[in-house]
Amino acid sequence: MTHYNAMNVLSMHALIAAYSKEGMEWVDQLRAVLETNISYALTLIQREFPGVSVSRPQGTYMLFLDCTQWCSAHHQTIEELQKAGIAVGVIWQDGRPFHGACHIRMNLALPHSRVKEAFERLKQYVFVD
């Protein structure tokens, strides 16, 4: 047995908590927050960010934004777009390692207020004409 499959005290208690009634309630609450965040992001992107496309994620809380049309229309590279988001405090991830030439990955596993704040910043400072 290696240390990768050995259970320590912390992981044992985490496992017990995860399968408790409270753990199930927490997962239900988490799923509701994630669904709210995903629906909000998809609607806002479709309505406010022309040239950016995204599909509803399946089994994850990561969005994969296709910025190909937006970058082309605004004569920006994906690097410039990514840096613009980071400059206003939106930390997102380059999509190229995930086979998206002009894509950005965005994590939505945050409180809804933070997701709204991030998209307001993107709308006001990054995805502008």
Segments (PLM) and residue ranges:
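PLP-dependent class I/II
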Residues: 1-129
